[in-house]
Amino acid sequence: MEQEKRQINLPVFLDYQSTTKTDDRVLEAMMPYFKQFSNPHSRSHSFGWKAESAVELARERVASLINAEAKEVIFTSGATESNNLAIKGVANFYKNKGNHIITVRTEHKCVLDSCRYLETEGFHVTYLDVQKNGILDLELLKSSITDKTILVSVMMVNNEIGVIQPIEKIGKICHEHGIFFHTDAAQAFGKISIDVKKMNIDLLSISGHKIYAPMGIGALYIRKRQPRVRLTPMINGGGQERGMRSGTVPTPLAVGLGEAARIAQEVMEEENIRIRELRDILYNEIKKHLPYVVLNGDYEQRIAGNLNLSFPYVEGESIIMAINNLAVSSGSACTSASLEPSYVLRALNIEKDLEHSSIRFGIGRFTTREEILYAAELIVSSIKKLREMSPLWEMVQEGVDLNNIKWDAH
């Protein structure tokens, strides 16, 4: 193990659900479009034609990864914008048809906040609970649909607990009721197989920096037929991206997303096998040497690179400080600066101490076996030390049932 430690660079990055390093191949593909710049919408000269050709190739590559047509993909600044455009765009365009939207309590904050905004505009939103394993109950979804429901938004893969929702079945339910179905696929695109036709998806949000492309670029798939989806744009201007998203498409960033999609299509299957093996090693090593470790979210219906664990009798923030040579998260990267427990874990209806002691490990393309073994050893030794300092741990060791204790308020 000492030799393995010397082979790794510290700190070890295990936060791949928050972001990913831009792949060197992606960066290489982008560089010419920084140097030989032009506006892809300038169609009166060869500079513009070249830029446009590069953007359209990128669009085709993104579309290919989800079995869509290139014309059904528009470029955005990222998944947050895509989610906002999908939800608000459908709601505003079809508001005369209905004013009811269904989503899930464990969605990304940009989906939840888009829905809350629409509530101030007179829309009614149903926020569905999930089961204890993080998966949506389809019967609950069915029973929530009304004749005013126009949109259902359910994320494909959860950013905190990594669970994969039964998207194809959800899409089928939506289409049987004539309802549009949107899915936030920021954590799924390039990680699992996606077929928008087979999965009955009408709108799908994509993030570049989650799949080894740069920050600042994303995409939105918008179904063109059976049914055709129409949106009210949020950004008005030159009418780029089929009038859905005005503004000059950043050629280098679009090229980067396209190249990342091409690479993902090539390596996804093999990469998932390797990443899943690393995740299993991490989980098994921790479980083998530590008692009272709780897995958050379903283990089987989960992307390969996610592991979310709670370590009772210690606080998540103290764990983070104790393992400062590991870059991990105690919640969603968008909200982990807050000391409030994760709303995703709260939605699982687990004990409060488990909410506060959770750590999310994100494993990705550049994670090595040596890093995983180092991480497991550091986690085990750190949790043991923290528990030794915890009076609650001492009581548990003595056989005291903490649930039966009545604490006096001071």
UniProtKB/Swiss-Prot annotation:
It is found in: Cytoplasm. This is Cysteine desulfurase IscS. One of its GO terms (cellular component) is L-cysteine desulfurase complex. Master enzyme that delivers sulfur to a number of partners involved in Fe-S cluster assembly, tRNA modification or cofactor biosynthesis. Catalyzes the removal of elemental sulfur atoms from cysteine to produce alanine. Functions as a sulfur delivery protein for Fe-S cluster synthesis onto IscU, an Fe-S scaffold assembly protein, as well as other S acceptor proteins. The modification N6-(pyridoxal phosphate)lysine is found at residue 210. Its EC number is 2.8.1.7. GO terms for biological process: [2Fe-2S] cluster assembly. The active site is at 334 (cysteine persulfide intermediate). Its main location: cytoplasm. [2Fe-2S] cluster binds at residue 334. One of its GO terms (molecular function) is 2 iron, 2 sulfur cluster binding. It catalyses: (sulfur carrier)-H + L-cysteine = (sulfur carrier)-SH + L-alanine. It comes from the Bacteria. The gene is iscS. Pathway: Cofactor biosynthesis; iron-sulfur cluster biosynthesis. The lineage of its organism: Bacteria, Pseudomonadati, Pseudomonadota, Alphaproteobacteria, Rickettsiales.
